[in-house]
Amino acid sequence: MVDTKDLINLETSLSNPFGNFGDDFSAQNVVSIDKKLLIDLHQLSLGPVLSEGPYSVVYEGLYKSVPVAIKIIQPDMSANVSPERKQKFQREVTLLAKVKHDNIVKFIGACMEPSLILVTELMRGGTLQKYLWNTRPHCPDLKFSLSFALGISRAMEYLHANGIIHRDLKPSNLLLTEDKTIIKLADFGLAREEAEAEMTTEAGTYRWMAPEMFSIEPIKIGVKKHYNHKVDVYSFSMILWELLTNSTPFKGRSNIVVAYATATKMRPSTETIPSDIEPLLSSCWAEDPAERPEFEQISDFLENILRNVCASSTSSPNIFEPEHSTSKELTNSPAMNCLMDQHVENSKKKNRTSCCCFRSACDNSL
């Protein structure tokens, strides 16, 4: 039974997402970008539109005769771009220019005048979201899904190791190469560098947002909800679930219902999830952020699972290997130790019903 009072509190929170969660935006701050990151507008050529959103349009184009993706912020009203939007653009450019990883889109340059323009490498395979939509109702091959999940985990492992929280991890922000063998993380507009103080602003997209970013209790003015980098782990769990089921989490439900479901411990059904992988999902979407594993642990676990899947098959998927090895010693996490123990047990006895050693999904799973 849904508590009407809880829904009212949630609706107030969702209608004013930035009101009581801290002040990431400040209109008084001057927006500036390192000149080394700026490129000459006259060296850009626009091609066909790749995608269009409420605040930007992405084109295929050329920079010095090299194919690129060109994102223009609010092209129809460039003279009236809000200070908040300019600051978001500055953060995205600054952070994207810092990161260099094989599973993160490559930054090429930016322009400030006459419009805000971000130029990155061109990913001709489109978004993961579009790929999944186009293949429904069929589920991707398990090796394919796991290799993509591993690529995402490696990208997030790199970001967290460098103190960066993405905060908007979802299929539409994951891009594919033309041959669909490599996946890369994009859109750093909501990303932040994790300071000593925890993050306090609600951000992200509701279906992939962690429960600690919602509240079914009224929040007093001046009181802030705190969260840390583990919100990305929760978002990853939803993407992994999508890769394994090719379904949208909480499909057909409004933002307010999704927020209520998440805040009250409801999770998508794991009925069709392979028993070896279900414990990973349950740990990643645990209500308590402290119970969620780090991405380093997730990468190691996925590597082991993928290795076993490939060994039992006659052919192996195209798995992208980064320059550095991720076969690192696992941190001494009780949650991940339990997860690995469960995986070993499942490998020994395939027909045994999987017993999740983390927080179980809500009995009223959606």
What are these regions (language model features)?
Residues G47-P54, V58:
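Protein kinase glycine-rich loop
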Residues H160-L176:
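Catalytic-loop of the protein kinase fold
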